[in-house]
Amino acid sequence: MIEFRNVSFSYGDAPVVENLSFSIQKGETVGLIGANGAGKSTIMKLMLGLISGTGEINVDGLPMNKQNLAEIRRKIGFVLQDSDNQMFMPTVYEDMIFGPRNYGLSKEETEKRVDSVLAQLGLQSLKHRHNHKISGGEKRMAAIATILAMEPEMILMDEPSTALDPVNRRTVINTINRLPQTKLIASHDLDMILDTCQRVILLSRGAIVADGEAEAILRDQQLLEDNRMELPFCLQGFQKK
C-alpha cells in the first residue's frame, strides 16, 4: 500500500527524518510512536504530499509526484488531532457531504454514503447537529465519519485519543478496530496503540529504531526508556526493571 525508500527531509540544514525505509501493507494497522520531535508528523505530511524530500515514496504503486498527487490524496484520509480544524462547516451533515461532492459524486450517491457511514458508526443522531453543540468525543467521531464518507483506502490518524474522557476514548478505539482500511496511527497514547495496532514503528530523532510486533515493542521497558517513553499504563507495575 505504502512504501518509503531511503526518504529524508530537512528544514534548512536541520535533518528531520533520515534515510527512512519501510512499507505498510494493505489492511495493516500500524502505530507510529516516538517522543516529541521524532518525526511522526513529518512522515504523515510526506505521505500526503504536503512536503517533499529526497528518496522514493510509492502509494498503491503510484510514485509520489505532482502528476499522481491528486489520485494519491483520494486514496488517503487524514483525521487531524484537533477536530475543530476538521469540522469547519455549520453541521455534521454539511461536513460529511463536502468531500464527496467535491469529488464529483451526485447528491443521491453522497446521501447514501453519509447515511451508510453514520449507521456504521452509530451516529445517526448527529447528522443535523451543529458542530458547536456536540461534545468533544462526538466531534472526534464525526471527524472520522467525514473521512469515511470519502471512502479512502488508507486512514492516517494523528493523536486520535487526545483530550477524550475514558468513555469516548474507548468508543474511538472500538471504532478504529472495526475499520477495514489500512491505518497508520501516530500517538503518544501507548495504551491506545497497544489496543489497536498489530505493528509498531518506533522513531527517534528521525530514524527508525524498532519496527515489529506491537506487543513485543510496547513491553520492552528498556527500549522505550532509551527513547524517552514509558511503558503503556496498563503494563506499569507488571514489568521488572
What name fits each language-model region?
Residues S187-H188:
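H-loop/switch region of ABC-family ATPase nucleotide-binding domains
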Residues I155-D158:
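Catalytic Walker B motif of ABC-type/P-loop ATPase nucleotide-binding domains
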Residues I33-A35:
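The feature captures the beta-strand-to-loop junction immediately N-terminal to the Walker
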Residues E108-L126:
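Conserved ABC ATPase "signature" region
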Residues A207-E230:
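Conserved beta-strand-loop-alpha-helix hinge in the C-terminal portion
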Residues I193-D195:
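A short, surface-exposed alpha-helical micro-motif characterized by mixed small hydrophobic
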